[in-house]
C-alpha cells in the first residue's frame, strides 16, 4: 500500500483524492469548506478528519495544497487567503498530530505548476 490522501483546500470546496505513488487518482470527491466568518480551524480539521477516517486503512500520508504564503519545509502557514483561520499555524504538524500520519503542505499555485510539469496539462 503506497497510497496517499491529497487535499486541495480552497475557499468554496476542499477537493480530495486517493492517489497512488504514481499520481494515479483512485477516487476523488469534494466537501464544502467551512466559512471563515462562521467557523474556525477546529471545524476545518473536523471536516478533514471525516475524510481521513474514510481512507485511513489505505493511506501512508497526507498532502495538502492551499492558498497563501507557506513554508513547505517546516509546514508553517504565514497567510492562508480565504482560510484565514489557518494563518500563523503549522498546518503540516497539525495534520500529522491530529491524524497520526506524515503530512506535507504546499502553495496551491506551486502544486498546479509541479503537477503540470510532472504529469502534463
What does each of the following model-derived ranges do?
Residues 4-8, 59-63, 104:
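Short glycine-aspartate micro-motif
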Residues 42-55, 91:
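Short, well-ordered amphipathic alpha-helical segments that serve as non-catalytic structural scaffolds
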Residues 41-42, 61, 71-121:
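Glycine-rich phosphate-binding loop and adjoining helix at the ATP-binding site
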Residues 12, 67-70:
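Short glycine-rich anion-binding loops that position phosphate/pyrophosphate groups of nucleotides
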Residues 2-43, 76-77:
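Short glycine-rich, Thr/Ser-proximal phosphate-binding strand/loop in the N-terminal lobe
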Residues 1, 57-59, 100:
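A general structural motif
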Residues 19, 70-71:
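Hydrophobic alpha-helical segments, especially N-terminal targeting/anchoring helices
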